[in-house]
């Protein structure tokens, strides 16, 4: 958490889980058929607008794959982080991962979901990861541009992958 320079105001919403798969199986029985290869993960809870946890993400600390595992406790809700803090009346930023969202004001993380919001597209800016050769990201960029949303286009010379990498490299918020 400290290495990634996560703002202190989020520390109380993040948790260490030494046995992630066992934790998941308690929260959502039979998610994992076994717990071989058990390892610790950072737990990032997803809260809805009523401050109720409806999903959580486990982020690996090492090279374990997948790096992110998101578990939905309510299958009817979109995998969106930040619903408990976003103000839909103000300009909204949408990034891919919860950690990236912690560095931007009024920000949501789509966490792999195709996010649908009932807000004016001109009031939203999508900030996809800087992966110009990733066909899935390029397709999603085109999709949101066609719907008249704002999209950040990274300069060709930027070698950093996402907002958190930029913060860790010494860049600051604008």
Q: Could you tell me what each predicted segment is?
A:
Residues 1-5, 9, 20, 25-33, ...:
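Replication-associated primase and helicase/ATPase modules
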Residues 4-16, 107-117:
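Short, well-structured beta-strand/strand-turn elements
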Residues 3-13, 61-65, 97:
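A generic short-segment signal for beta-strand/edge and adjacent turn/coil regions
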Residues 21-123, 137-138:
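Phosphate-handling DNA/RNA-contact segment within nucleic-acid enzymes
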Residues 12-17, 100, 164:
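Generic, ordered loop/turn and secondary-structure boundary motif
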């Amino acid at each position: 958490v400290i290495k990634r320079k996560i703002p202190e105001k989020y520390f109380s919403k993040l948790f260490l889980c030494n046995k992630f798969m066992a934790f998941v199986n308690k929260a959502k029985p039979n998610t994992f058929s076994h717990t071989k290869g058990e390892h610790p993960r950072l737990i990032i809870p997803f809260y809805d607008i009523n401050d109720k946890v409806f999903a959580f993400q486990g982020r690996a600390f090492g090279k374990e794959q997948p790096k992110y595992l998101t578990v939905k406790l309510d299958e009817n809700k979109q995998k969106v982080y930040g619903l408990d803090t976003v103000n839909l009346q103000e300009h909204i930023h949408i990034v891919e991962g919860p950690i990236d969202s912690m560095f931007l004001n009024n920000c949501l993380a789509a966490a792999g979901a195709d996010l649908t919001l009932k807000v004016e597209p001109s009031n939203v800016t999508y900030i996809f990861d800087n992966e110009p050769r990733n066909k899935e990201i390029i397709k999603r960029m085109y999709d949101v541009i066609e719907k008249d949303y704002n999209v950040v286009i990274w300069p060709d010379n930027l070698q950093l992958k996402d907002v958190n990498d930029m913060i860790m490299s010494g860049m600051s918020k604008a």
